[in-house]
């Protein structure tokens, strides 16, 4: 179930302030954030945001196609190593 339309999209204030200051100064620094829940706004386009995945900060370059999605969608938290190999061949 998605967020109510009357509430509008959510962005953490500290993240929005950092992006606004970068836009005013035309600076392209990497912004570190732990806010995976923040929605990507059009103001974020062209910036690189390092999103925390529980272990390290994953750099995510924001493009126009990402607007409206959450930051956490682009920094996976789980690493899939694949299923174990079939041991039937080695038992013979």
From Swiss-Prot:
GO terms for biological process: ribosomal small subunit assembly; translation. It holds the Pfam family Ribosomal_S19. One of its GO terms (molecular function) is rRNA binding. InterPro entries: Ribosomal_uS19, Ribosomal_uS19_bac-type, Ribosomal_uS19_CS, Ribosomal_uS19_SF. SUPFAM superfamilies: Ribosomal protein S19 (SSF54570). The keyword DNA-binding does not apply. GO terms for cellular component: cytoplasm; small ribosomal subunit. Keywords: Ribonucleoprotein, Ribosomal protein, RNA-binding, rRNA-binding. NCBIfam families: rpsS_bact. Protein S19 forms a complex with S13 that binds strongly to the 16S ribosomal RNA. Belongs to the universal ribosomal protein uS19 family. This is Small ribosomal subunit protein uS19. It comes from Halalkalibacterium halodurans (strain ATCC BAA-125 / DSM 18197 / FERM 7344 / JCM 9153 / C-125). The lineage of its organism: Bacteria, Bacillati, Bacillota, Bacilli, Bacillales.
